Design a protein with these regions (language model features):
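N-terminal glycine-/serine-/threonine-rich beta1-alpha1-beta2 phosphate-ribose binding loop
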Residues: 1-51, 60-75
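Glycine-rich, aromatic-lined ligand/substrate-binding cores of catalytic
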Residues: 128-146
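Residues that line or immediately flank small-molecule/substrate-binding pockets and catalytic motifs
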Residues: 30, 107-110, 139
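A contiguous active-site-proximal alpha/beta segment in oxidoreductase catalytic domains
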Residues: 48-52, 56-134
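Surface-exposed acidic, glycine-flexible loop patches that form ligand/cofactor-binding
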Residues: 17-20, 97-100, 144
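Charged/polar, solvent-exposed surface patches and flexible loops
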Residues: 14-17, 93, 134-137
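Redox-cofactor-proximal catalytic regions of oxidoreductases
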Residues: 10, 83-84, 142-144
Length: 146
């Protein structure tokens, strides 16, 4: 390991319980359904937060995060890594300048094969090094499938 003295935590709540006084900021890159809870705790503790997308899964969670961030008066950012690249910035410039006319409709396409629920993998025991219940966090309980 590159940093053998680095402290490791299996649960973000344990990190905050033990190290809240020793940290100024956090990067939330946990399972996506735990982004809002982890970000909320960090903001309540007055920590700066960089959170991977999605920040939340519901409008209510987003409103809560916005309120907590405003109260904490800390820096926050949601990660949208590729959207900071030159090709995305160029499109924004073209739209804002009017070079392509008024945009009235946008169509998108995604080539990822997201499951529509028809494919149901069989359940397996979770690997020994994975705390499946902890990973599920606030998500609905379901069997582990590799």
């Amino acid at each position: 390991e590159a940093h053998p003295q680095a402290k490791k935590f299996r649960d973000y709540r344990e990190l905050f319980d033990k190290e809240a006084n020793n940290i100024d900021a956090v990067v939330v890159s946990t399972a996506d359904h735990t982004h809002a809870p982890a970000t909320s705790v960090a903001l309540q503790l007055g920590k700066h937060v960089y959170c991977e997308k999605p920040l939340t899964h519901t409008v209510a969670e987003a409103r809560t995060i916005a309120e907590l961030a405003a109260r904490a008066k800390v820096a926050t950012q949601m990660g949208t890594q590729i959207h900071a690249e030159a090709n995305y910035r160029r499109v924004v410039e073209l739209v804002r300048s009017g070079a392509i006319g008024k945009v009235t409709e946008v169509f998108t396409w995604c080539n990822k094969g997201w499951s529509d629920g028809r494919f149901q993998p069989s359940a397996n025991p979770a690997p020994a090094n994975l705390d499946w219940d902890l990973w599920l966090g606030p998500a609905k309980s379901r069997p582990y499938c590799d």
